[in-house]
Amino acid sequence: MFILVSVVNICTYIHLHMFPLISTFTSIGLGVLMKDKGKEGKTIKAQNVTYQTFEKYVESSSFFFLVHNFLNSSTMKTLLLMSNNNSISEIPSFSVLKILWKNGIYIAHI
């Protein structure tokens, strides 16, 4: 699992930094995973997650999985999985999503 995560992280880094326009306008899925302290694979659910609460979630957790894919030609759906319990949380659709590296984790910016 950890090796797969490392490969995804490396591919994601190359994809976003070498081909930023392609990564924004293709339907290629994107996954980023941080390893929690002894609790790998746990997720969290929140109701109506907003961009502001997403930032707070990222700051408060050492583990999250971010994946996005196009719902249609103009919108993107983003899912956020975190380590506190066993459900899934959804971020509202963005027309453009950019992922930045900060303090060892990926953070979404509009």
Swiss-Prot record:
GO terms for biological process: DNA replication; double-strand break repair via nonhomologous end joining; homologous recombination; macroautophagy. The keyword Nucleotide-binding does not apply. It is found in: Membrane. The chain crosses the membrane at residues 18-34. It is a single-pass membrane protein. It comes from the Eukaryota. Keywords: Membrane, Transmembrane, Transmembrane helix. This is Putative uncharacterized protein HUR1. It comes from Saccharomyces cerevisiae (strain ATCC 204508 / S288c). The gene is HUR1.
